[in-house]
């Protein structure tokens, strides 16, 4: 009698072990896997937006609408080494925040109805963006102005949301209206330490962050070497990144300046824009 009972016990024990394995698998899938996924997602996300002049993104946060102004991300895309290869899609030249479902390509009562700053044609102006402490993935950045008012006007009408095709046409116009680093006399315009001569990123009309693995003042925060919280980000505090650009000999009572940051480490691009006048 002992042998059959022993065999039955072994069968039941094997089934018990299988049940425990299934239960533990379900616990992992339901509890630990999402936490791991969230942790990984948080660790690889880059974050930043235009700060000066006050971008629509900044105004969205200051109005209490945008909970994460640094989170308007175009992803996943090829952001490196070709800086202009990725289509902008719904992000357009002004950015789209999926977290709060905000499309900054369309004006509202909180942004886009008026110019936030007025400049003169050909003026050299200070521009600044804000990079999050936990989201600094290096790379290169630039500022652009589209000089086709008929294109820009589609982004100044609060009753109209530009289509993706119109957003891409605008992005192409902004790319053509790049404001080169080299146009400002005396400004340092180096090449990215993370780019190799011959690659598409080997250019100094764009601005570059410091080397991603630099031992001194690395990545984008190393450009100003400013204190943490020198600008606002919702995740871990921000650092300013400040440069100068020379405006074109062009006039408009209401136009846009667009900021674009291509991340080196991740396949992400950040876009934001500010409403300005050039008179």
Swiss-Prot record:
The keyword Metal-binding applies. The modification Methylhistidine is found at residue 47. The chain crosses the membrane at residues 24-46. It comes from the Eukaryota. It is a single-pass membrane protein. Cu(2+) binds at residues 47, 137, 270. Belongs to the polysaccharide monooxygenase AA13 family. This is Inactive AA13 family lytic polysaccharide monooxygenase. It comes from Aspergillus oryzae (strain ATCC 42149 / RIB 40). The lineage of its organism: Eukaryota, Fungi, Dikarya, Ascomycota, Pezizomycotina. The gene is AA13.
């Amino acid at each position: 009698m002992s042998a059959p009972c022993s065999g039955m016990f072994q069968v039941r024990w094997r089934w018990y072990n299988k049940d425990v394995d299934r239960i533990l698998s379900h616990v992992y899938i339901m509890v630990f896997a999402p936490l791991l996924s969230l942790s990984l997602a948080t660790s690889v996300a880059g974050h930043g937006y235009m700060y000066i002049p006050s971008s629509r993104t900044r105004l969205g946060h200051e109005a209490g609408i945008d909970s994460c102004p640094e989170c308007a991300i175009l992803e996943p895309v090829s952001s490196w080494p070709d800086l202009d290869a990725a289509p902008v899609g719904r992000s357009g030249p002004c950015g789209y925040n999926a977290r709060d479902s905000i499309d900054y390509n369309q004006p509202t009562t909180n942004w886009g109805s008026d110019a936030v700053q007025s400049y003169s044609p050909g003026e050299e102006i200070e521009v600044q963006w804000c990079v999050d402490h936990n989201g600094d993935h290096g790379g290169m950045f630039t500022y652009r102005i589209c000089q086709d008012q008929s294109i820009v006007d589609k982004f100044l009408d609060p009753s109209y949301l530009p289509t993706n095709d119109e957003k891409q046409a605008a992005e192409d116009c902004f790319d053509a209206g790049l404001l080169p680093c080299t146009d400002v006399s005396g400004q340092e315009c180096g090449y990215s330490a993370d780019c190799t001569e011959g690659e598409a990123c080997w250019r100094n009309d764009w601005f570059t962050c410091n080397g991603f693995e630099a031992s001194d003042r690395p990545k984008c925060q190393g450009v100003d070497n400013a204190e943490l919280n020198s600008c606002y980000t919702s995740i871990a505090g921000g650092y300013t990144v400040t440069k100068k650009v020379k405006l074109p000999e062009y006039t408009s009572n209401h136009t846009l300046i667009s900021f674009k940051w291509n991340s080196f480490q991740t396949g992400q691009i950040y876009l934001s824009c500010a409403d300005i006048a050039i008179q």
